Amino acid sequence: MLCLCLYVPVIGEAQTEFQYFESKGLPAELKSIFKLSVFIPSQEFSTYRQWKQKIVQAGDKDLDGQLDFEEFVHYLQDHEKKLRLVFKSLDKKNDGRIDAQEIMQSLRDLGVKISEQQAEKILKSMDKNGTMTIDWNEWRDYHLLHPVENIPEIILYWKHSTIFDVGENLTVPDEFTVEERQTGMWWRHLVAGGGAGAVSRTCTAPLDRLKVLMQVHASRSNNMGIVGGFTQMIREGGARSLWRGNGINVLKIAPESAIKFMAYEQIKRLVGSDQETLRIHERLVAGSLAGAIAQSSIYPMEVLKTRMALRKTGQYSGMLDCARRILAREGVAAFYKGYVPNMLGIIPYAGIDLAVYETLKNAWLQHYAVNSADPGVFVLLACGTMSSTCGQLASYPLALVRTRMQAQASIEGAPEVTMSSLFKHILRTEGAFGLYRGLAPNFMKVIPAVSISYVVYENLKITLGVQSR
């Protein structure tokens, strides 16, 4: 029987030996040879049961709930390979040792800022010989029985754009760990995110349609409110009219997400060279370019969504009929109306959303991440809601101008409305407030959209066989 033990040092007392977990299958004569020990700070002993479960899950190949000797050896070999890769990524100077500056730099690349004192504290916990540097042996010995490395754990728990869908797919794509890519879990995350987005958008579609109506039709002379807007929609087309435009809005999730992810992965290789994870500004550049490529590819669907949301009862028989009529009357160029303000809106939305989310993530990791990088449901929802709200607030004037340009049908002989002329017209006739028409229903849908997409995402993950949070 293979027995792994924890020795928990207590100041002023003898060391106490605690059984960590036992594994059957080791010959009795080898028991003393393969008895392993690991030292942890006494304040961390409360987590040893969680560590036990993680190690068993990581190495249990036959899913019998325990480790035999062969499984344990395989676990050690596989885990040592992963630790070697992480050690090399942290060793910026390639001198075989990690110092405090390299720890700070590696975490800074992920958007996690720590002080030099905090880096030295991390260093001291692993440094056995007092050199204030960590060599490979010290790194391996410290982490060998810890089944989750910090960097992949942060990436795993702090997914953002994959989980949260507020209707504006302009966020920077999430990172995926090496293991998620190798095992194919990344596409399951994307499928779960797409399904969550479909349910979330359908549930909040009435608020989204009201936002579009207020962006296009509300003015000083037509002061459309939330109650008045809903009353007008129901009176004109009944309760079903609240979901006009939702079909195309859901339909565009799959192609947009797939194109954006593939473009992001290709651009990452150009921007980040051979680095596994990108720095924040590199993520912003790569994510914005990927978003621009994805939006350019599916932009005609954005125009169709706006036209379908604004249609009167009986105006179009469906999406294809709407597309045919636009093509016949206005030409191909009509499918790219509002394209320029839409592209310009990517930078402020994606940039501020990413900056706010990373700032909140960094603050939480610094102050509350003691034994795990898992923030829990409410922290994740709060961070996602706040970052999405800030991103939308910054890019909203461009989104409003885009929607008005998409809604404008060409009249023969009439001049084309440009982005700059529309901005000037709104400011002259309605003031700065006019650039924020429809903001109230837009913000009203953020919390339910984020909450619904999270719940559906977590349930779809289980269905698709993705490891639960």
Curated annotation (Swiss-Prot):
Repeat region (Solcar), residues: 184-270, 278-363, 375-463
- Write out the topological domains of type Mitochondrial matrix: 208-244, 302-337, 399-437
Q: Give the chief site where it resides.
A: mitochondrion
Reading the lineage from the top rank, the first entry is Eukaryota
**Which PROSITE patterns does the entry mention?**
EF_HAND_2, SOLCAR
Pfam family for this entry, one: EF-hand_8
Segments for region (Linker region):
151-160
Q: Quick one: effect of changing residue 315 to H? A: Found in patients with recurrent kidney stones formation; uncertain significance; no effect on protein abundance; no effect on stability; decreased adenyl nucleotide antiporter activity; no effect on transporter activity regulation by calcium
Topology versus the membrane: Multi-pass membrane protein
SMART domains for this protein: EFh
Give the GO biological process terms: adipose tissue development; ADP transport; ATP metabolic process; ATP transport; calcium ion transmembrane transport; camera-type eye development; cellular respiration; multicellular organism growth
Which keywords does this chain's UniProt record carry?
Antiport, Calcium, Membrane, Metal-binding, Mitochondrion, Mitochondrion inner membrane, Repeat, Transmembrane, Transmembrane helix, Transport
Gene this chain is encoded by: SLC25A25
This chain belongs to the protein called Mitochondrial adenyl nucleotide antiporter SLC25A25
InterPro entries, from UniProt?
Answer: EF-hand-dom_pair, EF_hand_dom, GDC-like, Mit_carrier, Mitochondrial_sb/sol_carrier, Mt_carrier_dom_sf
Catalyzed reactions:
Mg(2+)(out) + phosphate(in) + ATP(out) = Mg(2+)(in) + phosphate(out) + ATP(in)
- Keyword Oxidoreductase assigned: no
Q: Which residues lie on this side of the membrane: Mitochondrial intermembrane?
A: 1-189, 265-287, 358-380, 458-469
What the record says about activity regulation is: Activated by an increase in cytosolic calcium levels that induce a conformational change of the N-terminal regulatory domain, uncapping the channel and allowing transport.
Give residue ranges for domain EF-hand. 47-80, 78-113, 114-149
Molecular functions (GO terms)? ATP transmembrane transporter activity; ATP:phosphate antiporter activity; calcium ion binding
This protein's species is: Homo sapiens (Human)
Say yes or no: keyword Transport present: yes
Residue span of region Regulatory N-terminal domain: 1-165
- Notes concerning its domains: The regulatory N-terminal domain/NTD, binds calcium in the mitochondrial intermembrane space and regulates the antiporter activity of the transmembrane domain/TMD. In absence of calcium, the apo form of the N-terminal domain is intrinsically disordered and binds to the transmembrane domain, inhibiting the transporter activity. Binding of calcium leads to a major conformational change and abolishes the interaction with the transmembrane domain and the inhibition of the transporter activity. The C-terminal mitochondrial carrier domain/transmembrane domain/TMD bears the transmembrane transporter activity.
Its annotated function is as follows: Electroneutral antiporter that most probably mediates the transport of adenyl nucleotides through the inner mitochondrial membrane. Originally identified as an ATP-magnesium/inorganic phosphate antiporter, it could have a broader specificity for adenyl nucleotides. By regulating the mitochondrial matrix adenyl nucleotide pool could adapt to changing cellular energetic demands and indirectly regulate adenyl nucleotide-dependent metabolic pathways.
Q: Which GO terms describe its cellular component?
A: mitochondrial inner membrane; mitochondrion
